Amino acid sequence: MNYLNETIDSLNDKLKSGAVSADQLVKDTIANIKKTDEKINAFITVDEDAKPAEDLDFNNKLAGVPIAIKDNIITNGLKTTAASHILYNFEPVYESTVVAKLKAAQATIIGKTNMDEFAMGSSTETSYFGDTKNPWNLNKVPGGSSGGSAAAVASGEVVAALGSDTGGSIRQPASFNGIFGIKPTYGRVSRWGLIAFASSLDQIGVMSKRVKDSAEVLNVIAGADDRDATVSEKEVPDYTSFLGKDVKGLRVAVPKEYMSDAVEEGVRKEVEAQIELLRANGAIINEVSLPHTKYVVPTYYIIASSEASANLERYDGIRYGYRAEAKNLDEVFLKSRSEGFGDEVKRRIMLGSFALSAGAYDKFFLQAAKVRTLICQDFDKIFEDNDVIVGPVSTETAFDLNSEISDQIKMYNNDILTISANMAGIPAASVPAGLSETTGMPVGFQIMAKRFDEGHVFQVADFIERSNKFYEQTPAGLED
């Protein structure tokens, strides 16, 4: 079963009518993943023992539908590695809240997708389990850190997948792979069972080829959770109710900082075309400014690395994961961490440890926290007079494998247009705008809204999807 032309609704219809059984769907999905993954390496683990839930109720849209999970989200009894050597053999004994909710909705968890190690990266090249390839061009990166989930959806291995987004890790790979991806409001979806990178920024979200499929999945995974104190108890609306609407009268802000000369010409043209589409259909377009955008990258890397250095202290080679051979306890700690973590993870641990040190805390971490407040205030001000903010997801389309992995500054700057949404805790998504005329690769259109206003994000994304029908295009890298 290849899902390039399938949706959750179409699968639900086939299962309900008996055109395909849930058991056969699982078998066909696994067979297709094995075949396709020889090219793209989207999965770290495929659950070959996966079985659909018993007594399926097809009033549940996800009943019997195979879903992929990013490998930093805990799955009970199914290996969860965070794409790291230090967790290469970790098999959890409990379930993350989002996976428990998917199973309660009778979805089938089909496997765990590749990612940058501990979600630290923008290309899925830091994985201990090898690079993932972009289905549109196998010589290009799929983006990161949720590159495996994005490639799995774009290649038709699954109809939807969960990802996580700390600074753009759902939206950038969604953009690079020509699919939809949404990072909900911080606190909209439980992080219980998400392997922490930066706890004040991390958020689980959804990736799918079609906007409605992500809305269906978010309907299931969103909402309160007693085990996560940061989750909001606000009522979760039916996100599909925001689909099928026009954009007449919608107030759309376009930050001038997001349309600078740093944006590739091919990206700019596709984004501008979507803005003009909104204008032509009655949206009110307002040019605005996010004046602290120039500070977001250093601010983010100080805060995120500081939180990461604390979160990753728990990996010591004693309780679980990789343990190096050593002569004494001190050597176990030292060798297990130095051998178990990759270079990028160690780089961020060192940066974070320095920023939190007594001599640097006030100068770096405290200052970054203050700038974060200013970034949040920039967004609050714009949302006083606007419903959504739009622009590019990335300044460029998918770049060549191995072309930026050794240039940390260039790699870190890949997040310059996505980080702010995490800083402000607002919902943000990428929807395909088209193909760049200069590179022939997909371009993502970013949509942001105020906190807990995912509805406007879905409304605009769905309108663009219905207008350009990008989902009808097939990734060129899959052609034999």
From Swiss-Prot:
Broadest EC class assigned to this enzyme: ligase
EC number, UniProt record: 6.3.5.7
Catalytic machinery residues: K70 (charge relay system), S145 (charge relay system), S169 (acyl-ester intermediate)
GO cellular component term of the entry, any: glutamyl-tRNA(Gln) amidotransferase complex
GO biological process entries: translation
PANTHER family with a match to the protein in the record: GLUTAMYL-TRNA(GLN) AMIDOTRANSFERASE SUBUNIT A (PTHR11895:SF151), TRANSAMIDASE (PTHR11895)
The name this protein goes by in its record: Glutamyl-tRNA(Gln) amidotransferase subunit A
Gene source species: Lactobacillus delbrueckii subsp. bulgaricus (strain ATCC 11842 / DSM 20081 / BCRC 10696 / JCM 1002 / NBRC 13953 / NCIMB 11778 / NCTC 12712 / WDCM 00102 / Lb 14)
Gene: gatA
